[in-house]
Amino acid sequence: ALACYALGFQWNKGSGGDAVDGNRIIEFKACSNWDLDTTSFSPSEEFDRLYFLRLDKRNDELYIYDTGLDSDGLKQVKVNKTQTLADQQKMGRRPRFSVINFILKPNMIEPIKKINIREKKVIDLW
């Protein structure tokens, strides 16, 4: 709900994504450990845009990253030395990998928004 508020999306309480932006399906993935995450994706996940939410518990701040990926782009991400996410999905598996280490860091993706939870403020970072 916080990310929907910050980004102006409608919270999707039904199936198919976490939020909607017009006719676009938005998927949120999040972690509460600043340095490490293990994120999983279902074998049949379909969305138009993936956002990653990263909590800085020490400072009560939530950072929002726009990965720029849709479900097709995400399928090209290498989740180990020999397989992409799509390879594992085709096997009916639920791939798990670090969004921080496999998407954000290699692509130098910076946060677009910061939510200061204590002060109840949304700050644009771009």
Residue spans for each PLM region:
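Nucleic-acid endonuclease domains
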Residues: 1-24, 29-126
